[in-house]
Amino acid sequence: MDWRERYERAAERYASGEARDPDERQLVQLANSAWAAGLSLLMLGNHEDAGVWLRRAATRYRESWDASGAPDAWGRPIGALKALLIAGDDAGDAARWALDAGAAEAESPIGRYAGVLALLVLGRDEEAGEVAVTLADGFPSDVADALAASDSAAYGTAVASVRHSFEERDSFLEDVPVPDTALALDVLASRRFT
């Protein structure tokens, strides 16, 4: 995998996108390009610059949410939360945003997933577990199991399953094959079980 080339393509897409009007669609594309650049740099071992790009992605996901007025675009707070977690940053503001938007009570499983991530970021593990058990229908069971786990062994088993399912996939956001969910869950585990 040529991570340098993937980074350069993503950075070029981001720079090109900044020259356009920043409507909702363009803001999502900017966020996705920043996400790809950050993950590519992470794979190159450049954690500092990866963090810059991942924080940029989180900011653009929030801007696109604010521009959209769509109360069910849950991928945006999820993207922001995961980007900040992987960057090693405090994701508390993004977590409060997701919860204030109603993620934990959302009708869709993906919305409730955003809520569970947000609750875990804020250290509200018991509440997160209660919401996580509602994800069963229409949601990847390995991710739901990891989110609901209250001990490190069960969590580790579930995250290993997430990694395994990642290896079986053939499509990835921005064509960047990085196990972002597992990386974010690893960060949460380091906070929950140590």
Which sequence ranges carry the predicted segments?
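Long, ordered, amphipathic alpha-helical scaffolds
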Residues: A144-T194
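Eukaryote-skewed repeat-based solenoidal scaffolds used as protein-protein interaction platforms
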Residues: M1-S165
